[in-house]
């Protein structure tokens, strides 16, 4: 068989130290898992009840359109309706479907370091991945992104807040970036961590996506909603973009369990907000501990903190964190903000 040449440099998305992570997930191996930016709480009671009610219907295919989920998303984002909503098997599928819409050949720009899946998605679709370095302060520089745009640029992906740094751009900065981009370049805002942003100048991008013909937002239920195991995400965009994204979406990609759990969770927005506020308070506590210990860290707006120290420091205290090496930060650790007891272990590791 002859394989596509552009697949040669790609490798499967595989978290490092997978065997240790699996042991931590099972509660064996004596380790607490704070590697993957997951929520330490399970689904909301409303989501659990919806799952129990839906279980007898598991012999039937789910709603292909995920209408109830789209309605819940639209209701949570003023100014949008179901025709503006994208759904997918995690926000990763939403991102992939958006990139499937652009012309090829061409290139995709994104800041770097950022979410490591972007180069793989671009490569599988036959698009070249171009990395634009972050500043020395670990921030995205919009001017650098704009300077990197060429006639071959088809899309720009902005992880905001950025993973693994937790730094962010304000709505004003994002709007200015969208204004300056050529109209035929798609700006994708990956907002997986948007619920954890404390800066009021950040919020409101969904309106930007509804107003602009070349802007789309991708979000997930894997973080603040605590539904990572169900693989469900959503997006917001113009009716035209949403229509084309639905044309390329794999049928039934959002299963029954994911649909009902995500719908119930989205409808309980006040409880999700309370969870996010807890994470923000705990993040501030962990950052304060890093500061008092004299460690260099990046002030974060996500549910994680990037700190300049070896993962071994935390592992000795029974905490498994993400190694910075594969994330573009050798010698650093990315620490997920967990529950109070888990964060106590992180702080206790500092001595």
Swiss-Prot record:
- Judged by the first EC level, this protein's enzyme class is transferase
Q: In which pathway does it act?
A: Amino-acid biosynthesis; L-histidine biosynthesis; L-histidine from 5-phospho-alpha-D-ribose 1-diphosphate: step 7/9
A molecular function (GO) term: histidinol-phosphate transaminase activity
Task: Report which reactions are catalysed by this protein.
Answer: L-histidinol phosphate + 2-oxoglutarate = 3-(imidazol-4-yl)-2-oxopropyl phosphate + L-glutamate
Q: Which Pfam families match?
A: Aminotran_1_2
Tell me which UniProt keywords the record has, alphabetically: Amino-acid biosynthesis, Aminotransferase, Histidine biosynthesis, Pyridoxal phosphate, Transferase
UniProt xrefs under InterPro entries: Aminotransferase_I/II_large, HisP_aminotrans, HistidinolP_aminotransfase, PyrdxlP-dep_Trfase, PyrdxlP-dep_Trfase_major, PyrdxlP-dep_Trfase_small
Residue numbers carrying N6-(pyridoxal phosphate)lysine = 223
The Enzyme Commission number assigned here is: 2.6.1.9
Q: Where are the transmembrane segments?
A: none
The cofactor required is: pyridoxal 5'-phosphate
Residue span of region Disordered: 1-26
Task: Give GO terms for biological process.
Answer: L-histidine biosynthetic process
How would you summarize the oligomeric state and partners of this protein?
A: Homodimer.
Q: Which family does it belong to?
A: Belongs to the class-II pyridoxal-phosphate-dependent aminotransferase family. Histidinol-phosphate aminotransferase subfamily.
Identify this protein by name. Histidinol-phosphate aminotransferase
